[in-house]
Amino acid sequence: MARVKRGNVARKRRNKILRLARGFRGGNGTLFRTANQRVMKALCNAYRDRRRRKRDFRRLWIARINAAARLNGVSYSRLMGGLKKADVRLNRKMLAQLAVVDPGSFTNVVAAAKS
């Protein structure tokens, strides 16, 4: 069998990992084995948190809508139920933005949900 020399392939593979690890502290950014572990962990965290971000934002929007709704004398669940009955098609992101940026308009939306 022919001898396989891994010069270029191995160096490229290592440099790819070290490039991804740039900016990591200490040996985590310069030593291949620890850098490889840190990069794998970072990629796992990134994958997990891309999904978690969607949940976190939804929770934030709901908290903001609930706070603004209670200032107008109605709970979050009653507001959302009323909006569904009134056929108001505003999603949670839009409602939260309204509550923060334009409380007057949000009050009008709450009034529509109450009636």
Swiss-Prot record:
Keywords attached to this entry: Ribonucleoprotein, Ribosomal protein, RNA-binding, rRNA-binding
- State whether keyword rRNA-binding applies: yes
Is Lipid biosynthesis a UniProt keyword of this protein?
no
InterPro entries, A to Z:
Ribosomal_bL20 (IPR005813), RIBOSOMAL_L20_CS (IPR049946), Ribosomal_protein_bL20_C (IPR035566)
Q: Which SUPFAM superfamilies does the entry link to? A: Ribosomal protein L20 (SSF74731)
A Gene Ontology term for the protein's cellular component: ribosome
Q: Which domain of life is it from?
A: Bacteria
Read off the CDD domains from this record: Ribosomal_L20
Tell me one GO molecular function of this protein.
structural constituent of ribosome
Biological processes, Gene Ontology terms: ribosomal large subunit assembly; translation
Give a short account of what the protein does.
Answer: Binds directly to 23S ribosomal RNA and is necessary for the in vitro assembly process of the 50S ribosomal subunit. It is not involved in the protein synthesizing functions of that subunit.
| HAMAP family associated with the record | Ribosomal_bL20
* Family label: Belongs to the bacterial ribosomal protein bL20 family.
Q: Known NCBIfam families for this protein?
A: rplT_bact (TIGR01032)
**The protein, known as:** Large ribosomal subunit protein bL20
Species annotation? Synechococcus sp. (strain CC9605)
